[in-house]
């Protein structure tokens, strides 16, 4: 369920909204279980969101705004609620909701010829779902099972500055652009425990996985991962774009856009060998590879016309106009 409140008077507008939900997970498995034990227990996670914001118009051209929000959402089904969702009904005793806290402060400018927004943001992620696994082998080196580890307490901090604008120097020309620079880093040393494909806790003795005395018992095998300060990968942390659209005639429009991507890092991954060599230790993860910066430019055009009295649009796009391949 959800609800929201809004306030709007004179130069000030504000809102407050919230919601609450229940996510229930269960699985039914007749491949690894008999009929009596095919259905797992149901695990429930209560999630909620709270967010609010305000905008104040200083005058007809300038405004300032602020927004804040908090989200608590259920962990993923696989590697979160269940230890081995493909083969086991065993639930993860350490599964917790993922949490996100975020706020932003901003300034806006509006005029007939120029519009711009500038904002700073700070977002914190807590308890992100993350899992990895390693082979369990017999004396001959043959794989007999998989040991899965569910990392707990994977946190990250995203913060940065964003600017976007639209300029209309002439009636027939629109110029738009944006710039964003961020500082996104992992910010914790999560720890995870090993379980086999049936969800049983594992110990590590004499170079082999064996059954542990209990979940999170002193002999329950684990790995801690030192991610503090490691760059978040998979998305450029510096981006910029510049484009223009020209209205050649009432029917014809031509546009050109260029986008720059910088400070993009490869995403970190836990290899099986990393887990094997660091059981009951702390694995220190170095900053990942920084992908070379790149840019790409696109050309687009559209033409409006009528066919039998019906409005029609013919449009086309040339992606990567300069055939960049970095």
State where each predicted segment sits.
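Signature of Gram-negative outer-membrane beta-barrel scaffolds
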Residues: 1-62, 79, 84-85, 191
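Extracellular loop and loop/strand-boundary signature of outer-membrane beta-barrel proteins
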Residues: 1-3, 32-41, 87-93, 102, ...
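Transmembrane beta-barrel strands of outer-membrane/channel proteins
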Residues: 16-22, 66-70, 107, 118-122, ...
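Surface-exposed extracellular loop regions of Gram-negative outer-membrane beta-barrel proteins
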Residues: 24-31, 58-103, 115, 120-152, ...
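Gram-negative outer-membrane beta-barrel transporters
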Residues: 122-124, 149-270
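C-terminal beta-signal and adjacent terminal beta-strands/loops
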Residues: 260-278, 292, 296, 302-326
């Amino acid at each position: 369920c959800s609800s929201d409140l809004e306030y709007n008077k004179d130069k000030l507008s504000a809102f407050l909204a919230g919601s609450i939900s229940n996510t229930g997970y269960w699985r039914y498995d007749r491949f690894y279980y008999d009929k009596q034990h095919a259905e797992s227990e149901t695990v429930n996670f209560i999630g909620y969101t709270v967010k609010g914001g305000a905008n104040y118009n200083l005058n007809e051209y300038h405004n300032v705004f602020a927004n804040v929000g908090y989200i608590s959402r259920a962990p993923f089904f696989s590697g979160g609620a269940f230890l081995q969702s493909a083969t086991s009904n065993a639930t993860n005793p350490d599964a917790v909701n993922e949490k996100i806290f975020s706020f932003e402060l901003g300034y806006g400018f509006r005029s007939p010829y120029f519009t711009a927004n500038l904002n700073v943001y700070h977002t914190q992620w807590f308890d992100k779902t993350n899992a990895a696994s390693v082979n369990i082998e017999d004396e001959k080196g043959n794989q007999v099972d998989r040991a899965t580890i569910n990392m707990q307490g994977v946190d990250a901090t995203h913060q940065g500055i964003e600017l976007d604008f639209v300029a209309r120097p002439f009636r027939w020309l629109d110029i738009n652009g944006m710039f964003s620079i961020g500082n996104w880093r992992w910010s914790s040393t999560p720890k995870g425990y090993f379980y086999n494909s049936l969800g049983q806790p594992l110990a590590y003795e004499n170079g082999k996985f064996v059954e542990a005395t209990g979940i999170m018992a002193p002999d329950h095998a684990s790995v801690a991962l030192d991610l503090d300060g490691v760059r978040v990968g998979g998305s450029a942390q510096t981006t910029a774009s510049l484009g223009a659209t020209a209205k050649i005639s009432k029917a014809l429009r031509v546009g050109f856009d260029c986008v720059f991507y910088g400070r993009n890092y490869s995403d970190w991954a836990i290899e099986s060998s990393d887990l094997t060599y660091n059981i009951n230790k702390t694995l220190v993860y170095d900053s990942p590879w920084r992908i070379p910066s790149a840019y790409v430019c696109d050309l687009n055009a559209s033409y409006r016309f009528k066919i039998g009295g019906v409005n029609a649009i013919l449009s086309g796009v040339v992606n990567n106009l300069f055939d960049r391949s970095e």
